[in-house]
Amino acid sequence: VKLHHRVDGPSGAPLLVLGPSLGTTTEVWRPQLAELTSSWRVLRYDLPGHGGSAPATGFTIDDLAAAVLGLVEDERFAIGGISLGGAVATTVALRVPGRVRGLVLCCTSARFGEPGPWRERAELVRAEGVAALAPALEGRWFTPGFDGRWVLEGLREVDAPSYAACCEALAVFDVTGRLGEVAAPALVIAGAEDPATPLDQALTLADGIPGASLTVVPRAAHLAGVERPGAVTTAIARHLRDGGREAGTRTRREVLGDAHVDRAIAATTGFTRDFQDFITRYAWDEIWNRPGLDRRTRSCVALTALVARGHLEELAMHVRAALRNGLTPDEIKEVLLQTAVYCGVPAANAAFAVARRTLDDLGPEGP
């Protein structure tokens, strides 16, 4: 499966991948684009036979997830999607948990009902074309009185066999039993009046994904981001901003210990708050949570850098962190011996003194 995509936003910004709902294109995310591209490089893709993507059949949601991953060169990224796009996003988060820094599931589900109706819709579309669905979809996508013609008009351009194949992929999609495996900070967005993926399906996602939050958008149906763009955009932007902070705080506690982090938070003032937020998101989420190195290796790098720059006031803290990350005292000694060669004997001598005092203070029970 080959997916057409487009990228907007600053070239050096973190990546956010956004997938559409069945029957729509990259344009369904247009109302959110201006706000999200102020902080993110946004990659939007089209489903097979939709927008700029070539027709295709015989694929699964897992195949679509693989195709999306083929578009992503970044080591870490956030991903979101509407309805079918949300199913793809969930599948990506399950396939590469260490790479997904944030997850947005908009008007979607872990399972889209019984297979029968989806297969019937596939047969109808093959016989009569996608445009035949427009009257029914208008009532599912939008609440009464909302003018969503600019979205509905796109149905005329959708390839019928590809649309039918999407229906058949949704018919067998079910990750209900795997929601507990989703590791990324997740936001679930539901339209309060969505008949396609009702609130109980959103609650299943929010309850099943560890730590997930739920936003219910009033006066909105299935395409909540089109019908109530302000509420949806605000929820997504806040989640992506706060999700990095939450993930960073969790990693910081795991590496440095609750006592240290609690002291740092208690000591935060209005003057230092922005800096604390910066290091939590940038150092402890964006760097420490990258999958390229394990935490033992990152501790070795941190110890070496602190010795090289003479930051002895931080070294004791990172000796304790190295023990938490699985290094033994003998391995810490080997790291410091290596620094004597490349950072200088005086620097290593001072580091050994700090490390010895730290290890002596901890005793045999460790950090």
Write out the residue ranges for each language-model feature.
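Catalytic active-site module of serine/aspartate enzymes centered on a nucleophile-bearing elbow/loop
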Residues: 212-244
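Acidic, glycine/proline-rich low-complexity segments that act as flexible tails and inter-domain linkers
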Residues: 242-296, 324, 348-367
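Active-site loop/oxyanion-hole signature of alpha/beta-hydrolase fold enzymes
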Residues: 27-34, 40-80, 234
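Gly/Ala-rich beta-loop-alpha elbow adjacent to hydrolase catalytic centers
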Residues: 81, 85, 89
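Alpha/beta-hydrolase fold catalytic core
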Residues: 1-17, 37-41, 234-243
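Flexible "cap/lid" loop of the alpha/beta hydrolase fold
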Residues: 90-95, 99-134
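Conserved alpha/beta-hydrolase catalytic His-Asp/Glu region
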Residues: 113-116, 127-181, 265
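Short beta-strand/loop motif that positions the catalytic acidic residue
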Residues: 182, 188-190, 194
